[in-house]
Amino acid sequence: MEDLLRVGVISSTHGIKGEVKVFPTTDDMNRFKKLKMVTLDTGKEQKELEIENVKFFKQFVILKFKGIDNINDIEKYKGKDLLISRENAVDLAEGEFFIFDLIGLQAEEEDGNSLGELTEVLQTGANDVFVIKTKQGKEILIPYIDDCVKKIDLNEKKLVVHLIPGLVE
């Protein structure tokens, strides 16, 4: 499991006093109000940044970091990820998972027949859909509903599914 979780990507600067526009990659933008620190992944190193101020503008979060007071000091980080530790992640309810924890799970039917690897989670609005890539390179789409997903075991890296008629040709 990953230790650092991406909560946003710096999309551009905002003004000339070192603020940045951040595209949030979290379901709840308001979580930025509770964060005190983030880790900036520059690609070469990871820097701890203290959040001084949080504002919202349309679909963006505007962040001001302590000690960065000039557009020139932050401009070079455009397109870079902002990360938090797993300890600072939101608490999940029963049956909820972080998508990145699901990627790579081995999918199998209830009888133990191997189907392949979970490679992607599509967020459709109604329910998520798991994309399982078979050894033959085909994709099986499994809706994340109780009728289809019987068990998710992160420790064993296993996903047990029930294939209802019509899911696989």
From Swiss-Prot:
Superkingdom of the organism of origin: Bacteria
Molecular function (Gene Ontology), one example: ribosome binding
Domain PRC barrel: 94-167
SUPFAM superfamilies: PRC-barrel domain, Translation proteins
Key words, A-Z: Chaperone, Cytoplasm, Ribosome biogenesis, rRNA processing
InterPro entries hit by this protein: PRC_barrel-like_sf, PRC_RimM, RimM, RimM_N, RimM_N_sf, Transl_B-barrel_sf
Pfam families in alphabetical order: PRC_RimM, RimM
Gene Ontology cellular-component annotations: cytoplasm; ribosome
BP GO terms, sorted: ribosomal small subunit biogenesis; rRNA processing
Subcellular localization, as worded in the UniProt entry: Cytoplasm
Family: Belongs to the RimM family.
PANTHER family: RIBOSOME MATURATION FACTOR RIMM (PTHR33692:SF1)
Comment block on domains: The PRC barrel domain binds ribosomal protein uS19.
Record function comment: An accessory protein needed during the final step in the assembly of 30S ribosomal subunit, possibly for assembly of the head region. Essential for efficient processing of 16S rRNA. May be needed both before and after RbfA during the maturation of 16S rRNA. It has affinity for free ribosomal 30S subunits but not for 70S ribosomes.
Subunit structure: Binds ribosomal protein uS19.
NCBIfam families: 16S_RimM (TIGR02273)
Name of the protein in question: Ribosome maturation factor RimM
